[in-house]
Design a protein with these regions (language model features):
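Radical SAM [4Fe-4S] cluster-binding motif and immediate context
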Residues: 131-213
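Glycine-rich beta-alpha loop elements in corrinoid/cobalamin-binding modules
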Residues: 8-11, 15-131
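Glycine- and acidic-residue-enriched helix-capping/strand-helix junction motifs
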Residues: 1-5
């Protein structure tokens, strides 16, 4: 389940209606993935890059650049948020958004569609106010709820500075508005969800809030 892409989808504003979330796994054949994207003839393709898919994405972006030369290719995700210019996949993309792209992806899409592309390839997303973010949980489909892991998060960031962990760079710690988060969780429960997987770096940092949840 691509949790991050659902955040982007939920926060696209007016562009949400003309955007499609298409998910694949590392077990899918690259040619099949390419064909699924190409047949949609998108104006913009956004791809989440992680340690486990960076090799496949590098090949995919190269193929997309060849087959869809007029399509904007935008990358994001942890694998391209900290080391950018050194990676081959970055060189082949039009843009890379580093950090929390909830609003930055929408803003970039708006500029690209308006014919006003930014000059720089790497776009550093600011730290968004979590109260301004549309929660992504309505983007979970009935099929997702029946067959996929349901990821949730009540906070972002980590107060610790462990040298071995990239989460040390995700500061400061911020909480989503608790009442809004709990209401979204109740909606998921009403839809049949009985198991939640929290992705918070430090869920129990605020014991009062974690106990309430």
């Amino acid at each position: 389940t691509s949790f991050g892409l659902r955040y982007l989808l939920a926060n696209l504003g007016d562009l949400r209606a003309v955007t499609e979330l298409v998910e694949f796994t590392i077990n899918d054949q690259l040619n099949d993935v390419l064909a699924e994207i190409v047949r949609r003839r998108p104006e913009i393709v956004g791809i989440g890059v992680y340690i486990w898919n960076v090799d496949a994405v590098t090949r995919l972006v190269s193929d997309l650049r060849r087959v869809l030369p007029d399509t904007w290719l935008v990358l994001g995700g942890p694998e391209v948020s900290y080391e950018t210019e050194q990676q081959a996949v970055v060189q082949q993309a039009d843009y890379v958004i580093t950090g929390e792209a909830d609003h930055a992806f929408r803003e970039l899409c708006q500029r690209l569609l308006a014919g006003d592309p930014p000059a720089g390839r790497v776009i550093a997303a600011g730290i968004p106010d979590l109260s301004s973010i549309v929660l992504p949980y309505a983007e979970y489909s009935g099929e997702d709820i029946a067959n996929r892991v349901i990821y949730v998060e009540a906070s972002r960031g980590c107060p610790f500075t462990c040298e071995f962990c990239l989460s040390a760079l995700d500061i400061p710690v911020r909480m989503f508005p608790v009442s809004e988060f709990l209401a979204a969780m109740q909606q998921l429960i009403d839809r049949g969800v009985r198991q939640f997987k929290f992705v918070d770096r430090t869920f129990n940092l605020n014991l009062k809030v974690s106990r309430r949840i």
